[in-house]
Amino acid sequence: MEKVKVAVNGYGTIGKRVADAIRLQPDMELIGVGKTSPNYEAIIADKKGIKIYTVKDNIGKFEKSGIRVAGTIEDMVKEADIVVDTTPNGVGATYKPLYQSLGKNALFQGGEKADVADISFSALCNYDEAKGKKYIRVVSCNTTGMLRIICTMNKISKVEKVRATIVRRAADPKEVKRGPINSIVPDPASVPSHHAKDVLTVIKGIDIVTMAVIAPTTLMHLHTMVLTVKDKVNRDDIINTFLNTPRIILVNSSRTTVSSTAEIIEVSRDMGRVRYDIPEVVVFEDSIYTNGNEVFLMYGVHQESIVVPENIDAIRASLGLMGKEESIKVTNDTLGIMKGYLL
């Protein structure tokens, strides 16, 4: 099988995970990563044998730090079949003219505005619609979590209304300049938060309102959600559907004593997962409650890794490499993504 050549522009929290995931795919070759600062992440990438590309003016800085440079970011893009842009929020749009001028397909992340791409993407929701699109935006971690739940619930009964509150982590574990550390901050105080609008870029016309707050934690986001569906639903049907859906796992707090994001992370550590990543949505089974045609639930979203499999599937969708079910299966198998129960 001839492998497609993939470049990752940006090598931070998401970029390094996507790069590692690409290296595990049977149909992809990581040709290199774009990095503008010679920090510890660049040093580690170099030690792992990943080719590093940077902007021309920074080549000397990398070499001074003992980091080998394979060329400029433009050189990398020229060699690639597709670029996964994981640069900081808003930066991806500034690179789009480069990708366009070289005729390269590109993926962008949820921090970019929706109009940067031809389509916003969630593998469980609209993989087929994204096939053959030159520019795809993989929605944010929180939006990915919401969409997995909503699109899965649609299999049981059409979702007509969603009301959700997002308790956001304040910072990633490595981020030392973000907070708060002793406050809960409305994000924003006005309603709705931007997450509702982002869901609408994938599922058109749904009645959705979201609110968000930032909490002093680094581990995961936590969502509380109320869905109104067309027909009366049964709790057992919801549980069984979740158990049989890839990238959603349940945790039974009563049985396992796992009842917090901290304990979910600890389980992932004890399972030996790389970086303790949890790319699955983790639904607290005990929280699932039905009242007529209303469904209530809570679930955790690991912000550092949930979008990684989405990026892998988006590569295949953009280049037309595989159908939806095949791509999701290959991605899940290579990345060790679970379904069913966490424990």
Swiss-Prot record:
Cysteine disulfide links: none
First and last residue of the signal peptide: none
Keyword line: Cytoplasm, Glycolysis, NAD, NADP, Oxidoreductase
Binding site for NAD(+): 13-14, 111, 169, 303
Single annotated GO MF: NADP binding
Residues binding D-glyceraldehyde 3-phosphate, per UniProt: 140-142, 195-196
Coiled coil regions in record: none
GO terms (BP aspect): glycolytic process; lysine biosynthetic process via diaminopimelate
EC number(s) on file: 1.2.1.59
GO (cellular component) term, any one: cytoplasm
InterPro entries: DapB_N, GlycerAld/Erythrose_P_DH, GlycerAld_3-P_DH_AS, GlycerAld_3-P_DH_cat, GlycerAld_3-P_DH_NAD(P)-bd, Glyceraldehyde-3-P_DH_2_arc, NAD(P)-bd_dom_sf
Gene3D superfamilies, per database record: Dihydrodipicolinate Reductase, domain 2, NAD(P)-binding Rossmann-like Domain
Keyword flag Oxidoreductase: yes
Listed pathway(s): Carbohydrate degradation; glycolysis; pyruvate from D-glyceraldehyde 3-phosphate: step 1/5
Subunit structure: Homotetramer.
Family: Belongs to the glyceraldehyde-3-phosphate dehydrogenase family.
Protein name per its UniProtKB record: Glyceraldehyde-3-phosphate dehydrogenase
Primary gene name: gap
